[in-house]
Amino acid sequence: ESAQPHMGRLIFTLSNSYGELYRKYLTVTQGNYVPPTVGAVGKLVEYILGNSDLSGAVGSDKAMPLQYSESTIEAVILANDAAGNNNRKLYVGDNNGLERSAIVLYGADFAMANDPVTKYPAGRKVTLNLEDAKYYAFNNVRQLTDVVVTVGDEEVELVVPSLSVEKFNTGDYQAQYVKLNNMTPAQSFVGKPWTATESQSVTLNDASGKTLT
């Protein structure tokens, strides 16, 4: 059987409340699904998690040389410090929707003051030079410093996986864009007044009452 996808188009003739007819079109593609495979960043994360020497690198003052076997790897920019909320951070990954497929880069060049939207636009493919990279975990988030980022010309659409609360709470999708559906604030937060000058947090639950942590 052919591995090439087959495409068909269905046409529906419908009637509105005034009796007027109109058409709706539905395109259906049939073919062999090829699941995503672990990419270069995913393999890097696997190396970090499997390296017992790096387990003690907690906090920037305990950063350790990465000493990865690959001097350069390819990645996609997932997010930058456009609004100053990701202070000096650049989020990069394989952009395949898999768990453990992204990591945070930390450095002064990624700061909002250096116009990261122009220099490091989300969706752009990049090459990461890891020869002098150092690793540490900050608040349980995996980070690299001293990474040289070369931005390419190719831009791709970001893959945003939809997660259950259980999957999100594992922490395996850190540094990635994700989507959670049907989330609502806990009842204790409903109707609560907010002020722009206060730091506040909200507990979110899914439709079954499971809490996002």
Question: What are the language-model segments listed below?
Answer:
Residues 16-25:
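Short, exposed coil/turn segments at beta-strand boundaries within extracellular/luminal domains
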Residues 5-16:
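A short beta-strand micro-motif common to beta-rich folds, especially ectodomain repeats
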Residues 1-2, 213:
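Accessible peptide chain termini
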Residues 25-213:
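Extended non-catalytic accessory segments flanking core domains
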Residues 2-7, 120:
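Surface-exposed, short loops/turns at beta-strand junctions within beta-sandwich domains
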